């Protein structure tokens, strides 16, 4: 590791999904270990950096939070370039956000590198009393059939 880079590995994460599924909250929780229940719509993209130590290696993660609105899709397409991991997020209390995952996966397949890792995230599990999408639905509908690496809630 050179003193200029200050990391051994660089990973680019891209968070995608419908507007309102909690992508920005995931980013804030991961990068800064904070939570905000105020919904602020992302315009274009947001970006955070977090450096981790994994088995004595410094891993720098660049995490890109994309806007979920249709009008920003042309802007966010360029952010797929060089992505190591794409996190597809849906809201477990919003069936429509789950049903739109197929469209998001098509975007990933068209725009991301062939070797990108895909992670499916069912968000807002703290609101499980309002659940519209079961864990098994995610597993059967997307995880088992679309070559995803991880499914988590």
At which residue positions do the language-model features occur?
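TRAFAC-class small GTPase G-domain
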Residues: 1-153
């Amino acid at each position: 590791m050179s003193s200029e880079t200050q990391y051994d590995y660089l990973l680019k994460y891209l968070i995608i999904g419908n507007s309102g599924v909690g992508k920005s909250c995931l980013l804030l929780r991961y990068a800064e270990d904070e939570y905000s229940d105020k919904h602020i719509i992302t315009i274009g993209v947001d970006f955070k950096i977090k450096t981790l130590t994994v088995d004595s290696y410094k891993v720098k993660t660049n995490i890109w939070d994309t806007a979920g609105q249709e009008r920003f899709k042309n802007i966010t397409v360029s952010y797929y370039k060089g992505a190591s991991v794409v996190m597809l997020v849906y809201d477990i209390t919003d069936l429509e956000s789950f049903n739109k995952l197929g469209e998001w996966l098509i975007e990933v397949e068209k725009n991301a590198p062939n070797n990108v890792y895909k992670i499916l995230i069912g968000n807002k599990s703290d609101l499980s009393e309002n659940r519209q999408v079961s864990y098994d639905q995610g597993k059967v509908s997307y995880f088992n059939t679309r070559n995803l690496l991880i499914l988590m809630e």
